[in-house]
């Protein structure tokens, strides 16, 4: 197809098994507008190289299965997503309903002693690509925030009992 041909010719054949810092002029740091080939910068440069060949709406580039960047053609705006996980137990039930009603509404999640899930969380931040660093945020700081605000508080807890917010709120995926 034309899509595969454009991607192969304009991107894959030029980048595969190459040292990114020296492959394209956009990554030449001796030039005033040269940038580092971070995931965020790379997805933006790929967009610029493909836009004359394809009717792009958005572009996603995976650095690895748990880290990717999205670009939608808007100047230096990009999105960075970190995927992580935590394990937690919960019981979905309303105290004002009998057990059989809770089971009809919430299924196995209404078991009297609760049960557990392995939750996968995608956390996406939007920002401007910094011309000096090629990044939209400090990835180490973002990972620390995710750990402090999501993983540590929720991992291996019984949400209904260990997280005060869920004392009066049913811990559905939407509420978590």
Where are these regions (language model features)?
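Charge-rich, low-complexity N-terminal segments
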Residues: 1-176
């Amino acid at each position: 197809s034309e899509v595969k041909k454009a991607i192969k010719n304009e991107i894959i054949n030029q980048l595969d098994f190459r040292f990114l810092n020296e492959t394209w002029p956009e990554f030449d740091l001796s030039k005033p507008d040269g940038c580092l080939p971070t995931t965020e910068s790379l997805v933006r440069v790929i967009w610029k190289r493909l836009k004359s060949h394809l009717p792009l709406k958005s572009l996603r580039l995976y650095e690895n299965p748990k880290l990717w960047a999205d670009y939608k053609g808007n100047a230096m705006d990009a999105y960075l997503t970190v995927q992580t996980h935590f394990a937690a137990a919960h019981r979905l039930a309303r105290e004002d309903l009998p057990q059989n009603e809770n089971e009809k509404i919430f299924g196995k999640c209404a078991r009297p002693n609760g049960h557990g899930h392995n939750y996968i969380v995608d956390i996406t931040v939007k920002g401007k690509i910094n011309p000096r660093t090629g990044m939209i945020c400090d990835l180490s700081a973002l990972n620390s925030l995710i750990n402090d605000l999501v993983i540590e508080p929720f991992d291996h807890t019984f949400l209904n009992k260990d997280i005060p917010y869920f004392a009066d709120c049913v811990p559905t995926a939407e509420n978590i």
